[in-house]
Every structure is written in structure tokens, then in C-alpha cells.
Amino acid sequence: MGMSAISTETLSLGYGDAVIIDELNLTIPKGEITVFIGSNGCGKSTLLRSLARLMKPRGGSVLLEGRAIAKLPTKEVAKELAILPQGPSAPEGLTVHQLVKQGRYPYQNWLKQWSKEDEEAVERALKATKLEDMADRAVDSLSGGQRQRAWIAMTLAQETDIILLDEPTTYLDMTHQIEILDLLFELNEKEDRTIVMVLHDLNLACRYAHHLVAIKDKRIYAEGRPEEVITCDLVQNVFSMNCQVTQDPLFGTPLCIPHGRGRCIVQEAAFTSHG
């Protein structure tokens, strides 16, 4: 593993009396796509929020390129790291252009108002997300995929090297899921952005991630390249699900086929669990 964009040292998180993450040590590789996986309630989203300083740790620390993030000025953090939470909502009537402009907040102060540089950053973000022709449309009039692209455009206008996204494909149909993940993959591939995501679809996580982090029992259960990490045993232990793990015929990445009930149109189906 190369340089780290973000890391944690004995990080502990919780709500009230509940411990969600316990003394977790994590390294997010710089310039790669990292995906958190795990069962519902395992702490994936909580961990992601803490990496963006949206949640105060009970113990330990989060380091942004080696610096304690808790000690950094808010605008300095916002120039280096952007986060898109799950299911964000925009005020009624807000246009795509107005939303994307919000990404320039870290660069504004009473001395420096809106500039040509800011407008150019917004235009680049709209172009990258293919929203130039929709800039004057209200965000709430867009389809689910278009709306999610508008929010991603806002994070792009922020011009950070690190982007965190909490379940960016939730509530999207298959076409729009691939559209969003392809966009993020392209940002990583062409601009070397560090992308950190929470995803529920294990097969899409395996396709797009360079680095997979499986979380269970408040800690990291396994991490590494998907092809090194994903086994039937891991899926059983992390998700309590029996499955067959094979190879994606298009991409060569791990493909998880869950056991269970359903129509069977092959003469013989061997539902055996093995690692």
C-alpha cells in the first residue's frame, strides 16, 4: 500500500452508551477507490462521517495526510476533502447551477468574493457530470440519476483531492447506478482523486474498488484488493449469507451469487458453500 490520504489511529466512535467503532486502525490509500462493506448497522456510515470530521471521536484520532484533522481549520479541511451524505435534499426551486456554486464556499470570505476562477470551477464540474444543459433547471425537477450527478458536481466544484460518498447509488435504478459509479471511476482514473464510498451492492463494490474494507463487530474484519478479500467464508461471517463466489465474466472481479429460494431453470444446481 502506498501513501495514505486519510488514516485513523485507535479510533472509537459511538452514540450514547452504544459503541459503534472500537479502536479501529485504518489507512485509506491515496489515489485509489476504497469501499466500505458490511451488514446494516455495522458502522460504515458512522466511520465515513468521522473521516470528514462530522462526528467527534470518543477516542483515537483521524489523520488527513498525516495531520490531526480535529486541529485543522474548517475551510482548510473543506479545500482538501468533500463529503456527499446519503440522500441529500436541496431547497425547493434551487437550480443546478446554484447548487453547484455551493461547492465554492471554502474559497469565499469577506475579502474574496465570487471570482472568474470560481465560475470556471463550476463550469468544469457541470461539464464533468454532463449537466451543462441542465444548469438552469430546478434540482427537484430532475430524475434520480440527474439529481445525484448534480450533488456530485457540487463536490467537484469544491476541487478537493478526496471525495467521500455515503451510499451514492441508493434508490437509483441499475442504469443510473452504473452511470454514477462510472463517473466516480473516471474521476479517479483521469484526475487521481481519492474516492471513499459506502456501498451495499457487494458485486459493484468488487468491480469498482481498488481497496475493500469489510467491517464487523466494531472493527475491520478484512481489507485489501477485492479479489484477495472476497470469499464464501467472508460473506458468511460478515453478512451471515451462504453464497457461491465466482468470477465476473466481463471484468474478472469477484462475483457473489447468494444461495436461497427462487426459480431454478438448470437441471442440477450445486448449492454448496466453500471458501
Curated annotation (Swiss-Prot):
It is a peripheral membrane protein. GO terms for cellular component: plasma membrane. GO terms for molecular function: ATP binding; ATP hydrolysis activity. Residues 6-242 form the ABC transporter domain. Disulfide bonds: none annotated. Induction: Induced by iron starvation, partially repressed by fur. InterPro entries: AAA+_ATPase (IPR003593), ABC_transporter-like_ATP-bd (IPR003439), ABC_transporter-like_CS (IPR017871), P-loop_NTPase (IPR027417), Siderophore_ABC-ATPase (IPR051535). Keywords: ATP-binding, Cell membrane, Ion transport, Iron, Iron transport, Membrane, Nucleotide-binding, Transport. It holds the Pfam family ABC_tran. ATP binds at G38, S39, N40, G41, C42, G43, K44, S45. It is found in: Cell membrane. Its main location: membrane. It comes from the Bacteria. GO terms for biological process: iron ion transport. Disruption phenotype: Strains lacking this gene show a reduction in growth stimulation by the iron-hydroxamate siderophores schizokinen and arthrobactin compared to wild-type. They also show a reduction in growth stimulation by the catecholate siderophores enterobactin and bacillibactin. Belongs to the ABC transporter superfamily. The iron-hydroxamate siderophore complex is composed of one ATP-binding protein (YusV), two transmembrane proteins (YfiZ and YfhA) and a solute-binding protein (YfiY); the catechoplate siderophore complex is composed of one ATP-binding protein (YusV), two transmembrane proteins (FeuB and FeuC) and a solute-binding protein (FeuA). Provides the ATPase subunit for at least 2 ABC transporter complexes; YfiYZ/YfhA/YusV involved in import of the iron-hydroxamate siderophores schizokinen, arthrobactin and corprogen, and FeuABC/YusV involved in import of the catecholate siderophores bacillibactin and enterobactin. Probably responsible for energy coupling to the transport system. This is Probable siderophore transport system ATP-binding protein YusV. It comes from Bacillus subtilis (strain 168).
